Curated annotation (Swiss-Prot):
Enzymatic class: oxidoreductase
Source organism (scientific name): Cyanothece sp. (strain PCC 7425 / ATCC 29141)
EC number(s) on file: 1.3.7.7
Residues engaged in binding Mg(2+): S14
Cofactor binding: number and manner: Binds 1 [4Fe-4S] cluster per dimer.
Gene3D superfamilies: P-loop containing nucleotide triphosphate hydrolases (3.40.50.300)
Protein name: Light-independent protochlorophyllide reductase iron-sulfur ATP-binding protein
Length: 286
């Protein structure tokens, strides 16, 4: 099974991806996480350091694939999750899609691409050009990380459009949305009402999720010394269980940008009255 995780830049995709990878490993699966971001920090919370990228390794070998060994590019992370960082082209030059393609090509050359139960692509930001939409070419499911905000859901809608486009050529489904560190979900609910898709999980506003990124540890590793965090791990285990059940998923219909802008902005400008306030108002009118 191959997963591609997308979402607005800074929304917490890498933190979410790392914890999902560990959750899948806890369920007995052999997992490979591939970071698809020139910053090459996707697997930081799994390994505790910035591992060398595949592109850097290939350059050091003059692109002689036969001189590259699995241990040159695959690093063992927390919980037994294997980690790879694709890296990226020089800033302002090249194409990220080419880098992803070279990464998959090398892993296949090493007979590593088909050795895993789950491969998770953690893809940078909300860039959905042909290049950074490339992981969708290999994925069975796409997961979109969002919050309860306008910008994140606007980005989610554009990513959903990419899933719809890629689903024309191979079996690809949107597994659903993951709400990350959000105190409310009313805007998320408004969006999925307009654009039907599953919501896999809503993680509340938990400061330890942000802290885990700074510490370079997953929530599972932090919970080893602080059992009070086990309840946070349960959110990720729930996501893993849903994925392993191979959900039907959806080919999202999406919404035109202008329609979505009107829908979400109207939610902000004309919020629904508080339920308690509405009941009080009705009593006053009796």
């Amino acid at each position: 099974m191959k997963l591609a995780v997308y979402g607005k830049g800074g929304i917490g995709k890498s933190t979410t991806s790392c914890n999902i990878s560990v959750a899948l490993a806890r369920r007995g699966k052999k997992v490979l996480q591939i970071g698809c971001d020139p910053k090459h920090d996707s697997t930081f919370t799994l390994t505790g350091f910035l591992i060398p990228t595949i592109i850097d390794t290939l350059q050091s070998k003059d692109y002689h694939y036969e001189n590259v060994w699995p241990e040159d590019v695959i690093y063992k992370g927390y919980g037994g999750v294997d980690c790879v960082e694709a890296g990226g082209p020089p800033a302002g030059a090249g194409c990220g899609g080419y880098v992803v393609g070279e990464t998959v090509k090398l892993l296949k050359e090493l007979n590593a691409f088909d050795e895993y139960d789950v491969i998770l692509f953690d893809v940078l930001g909300d860039v959905v050009c042909g290049g950074f939409a490339a992981p969708l070419n290999y994925a069975d499911y796409c997961l979109i990380v969002t919050d309860n905000g306008f910008d994140a859901l606007f980005a989610a809608n554009r990513i959903a459009a990419s899933v719809r486009e890629k689903a024309r050529t191979h079996v690809l489904r949107l597994a659903g949305l993951i709400g990350n560190r959000t105190a409310k979900r009313d805007l998320i609910d408004k969006y999925v009402e307009a654009v039907p898709m599953p919501v896999l999980e809503i993680l509340p506003l938990i400061e330890d999720i942000r802290v885990s990124r700074v510490k370079g540890k997953t929530l599972f590793e932090m919970a080893e010394s602080d059992p009070s965090l086990n309840y946070v791990c349960d959110y990720y285990l729930n996501i893993a269980d849903q994925i392993l059940a191979r959900p039907e998923g959806v080919v999202p219909q999406g919404a035109p940008d202008r329609d979505l802008f009107a829908l979400l902005s109207d939610f902000y400008l004309n919020p629904a009255p508080n339920k308690v306030e509405q009941e009080d108002l009705e009593l006053m009118m009796v």
